[in-house]
Amino acid sequence: MAKWNSDCSLEFGVFVLNGYEYLLGFLLISSLVPILSLTASRLLRPGRRGPERRTTYESGMEPIGGAWIQFNVRYYMFALVFVIFDVETVFLYPWAVAFNRLGLLAFVEALIFITILVVGLAYAWRKGALEWS
């Protein structure tokens, strides 16, 4: 069981936590502030409104047309290829920063990674996934 000592330290069996009072206070306050603000907003909000609350709000104007518009699949293909190469950049940046310290094995691993992505790009290009027409 935990007990407080006279020198403001919390003792859990063998472990003594000394000087963590500020951290405990910070955690307590940072937990209470969002809980209290959400509770206050729930208590002070206006009552529920009628059917106009369920309508779509679009820049203060009545919405024109339906919300479900079909996009051409080409947009998705370009977005998918972009995301793949964007993730490649995210993975290669730390490798490039630490290139001098990593050695030959890391170079070979990065080369294999880039080769797999280039093969995927060639496959998408050959299948016509990058053609706009």
Swiss-Prot record:
Quaternary assembly: NDH-1 can be composed of about 15 different subunits; different subcomplexes with different compositions have been identified which probably have different functions.
Signal peptide boundaries: none
PANTHER family per the UniProt record, alphabetical: NADH-UBIQUINONE OXIDOREDUCTASE CHAIN 3
Any one of the GO CC terms: plasma membrane-derived thylakoid membrane
Gene Ontology biological process: photosynthesis, light reaction
Function: NDH-1 shuttles electrons from an unknown electron donor, via FMN and iron-sulfur (Fe-S) centers, to quinones in the respiratory and/or the photosynthetic chain. The immediate electron acceptor for the enzyme in this species is believed to be plastoquinone. Couples the redox reaction to proton translocation, and thus conserves the redox energy in a proton gradient. Cyanobacterial NDH-1 also plays a role in inorganic carbon-concentration.
Designated name of the protein: NAD(P)H-quinone oxidoreductase subunit 3
Gene3D superfamilies: NADH:ubiquinone/plastoquinone oxidoreductase, chain 3
Subcellular location: Cellular thylakoid membrane
Alphabetized UniProt keyword annotations: Membrane, NAD, NADP, Plastoquinone, Quinone, Thylakoid, Translocase, Transmembrane, Transmembrane helix, Transport
Originating organism: Synechococcus elongatus (strain ATCC 33912 / PCC 7942 / FACHB-805)
Membrane topology according to the record: Multi-pass membrane protein
Transmembrane segments: 12-32, 77-97, 102-122
